[in-house]
Amino acid sequence: MKTLFVTYHYLHGNGGGVFASRGFVNAFAKLSERLTLLCPVKDDVAPEGIAPSARVIPVSYEKPRWRKYIDLLLGKIHRFYGVFDQVLASEHFDLVVFDTCYVSFRLIQKVRRRGCQVVTIHHNFQCEYVRDNYRFPVRFPLLFWTRICEREAVQNSDLNLTLTEADRQSLAKAYDSAGKACIRVIGVFEYRNDAGAHIYPLSEEPVFIVTGDLSMRQTVEPFLEWMHEYLPILREVVPGAKVIVAGKDPAQSFIRACETDGIEVVESPTDMASVLRRGRYYLCPSSKGSGIKLRVMDGLKNGMPVLAHEMSARGYEPFVGHEVRCYNTPDSFRKAMKEMLTVPFDVETIISHYQDTFSYEAGIARLQGILESTILEK
């Protein structure tokens, strides 16, 4: 099949959305006779980690911030309107994949009129994500258009793919009361087949590692709340425990708050693996946002037991109760912490389970199975 793939994410760097989108692009490229990729670029930074078989068409959007805000108010929520029409008319595509509902907005009906099948990948229940991450003046117009484009995508796609079961249920409840939409869970996976995990010795000391984008509200605010409510419990249960938090672009106020409580902050590390190898346990306290918290994969990939807020455990159900322990209250945190410290674990076993679930090959197999049982069956 010939596939046109349109993504909302800049395909360079190490963000969670970037990681997931690379995997989807490469998996669809693997399963397609030919894949054309429309992707955003800025500052002429080329996409990274994309299958060489993909035909890449980069699209820039160099406008001042005030003009972008006017575009948002008018409902111009992506950059692909003109170029998409040209590419769609240039050849016959069997399948068009929209990577987020945003890039499908006002394009999906054009695709359907051409007789192409449509897949939309939902990285989050987008309305919930907007509520948790954006403030005035962007929040309200973005939320308004998000509701419209998310509904349009769910109701007009031949197949909707989500990263978690929770998001599948949220989308169905919000936009599919009639039960007509096809919504399946694909999860996430590595974007290349040589991304095998490496076994390194973990710290023998009780060192807890937290990673994430420290410029995002859904990372910073829950962590500050965790420091206030849960850090005293951690230090009570594990005297001498050390907490290290690493991520890009932390605010100075965040760094000061951490240092006051004796938490080490590693700013914008160039090698996250070296930070992870300093720890023994992985901690994910994020309690906001939808989608899947890809940073939990950092811990599992390195063979570390994970302690996560139940919101952060979405998408990791096969690991819950074993490699991943969950909490949502101080009492459940204390219980999960004690279990994690007393139950023996094997680094190689955790890594093997990670590979079985999140390897590139596992992702391709999941995608192929979903396509064959849905749109390719038609």
Label the model's feature ranges.
Residues M1-G49, E91, E236:
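N-terminal subdomain of nucleotide-sugar transferases
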Residues T3, L95, V111-R131:
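Active-site proximal beta-strand in glycosyltransferases
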Residues N26, V185-A257, D261, V265-A273, ...:
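Conserved catalytic-core segment of nucleotide-activated headgroup transferases in glycan assembly
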Residues I57, R151, Q155-A195:
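Donor nucleotide-sugar binding/catalytic pocket of nucleotide-sugar-dependent glycosyltransferases
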Residues D85, Q126, F140-N160:
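Membrane-proximal helix-turn-helix segments that form the acceptor-binding/catalytic region
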Residues D158, R277-G291, N302-M304:
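Acidic donor-binding loop of glycosyltransferase active sites
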Residues R295-D298, P305-H309:
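Short hydrophobic beta-strand element within catalytic cores of glycosyltransferases
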Residues T342-I375:
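A charged, aromatic-enriched C-terminal amphipathic alpha-helix characteristic of glycosyltransferases
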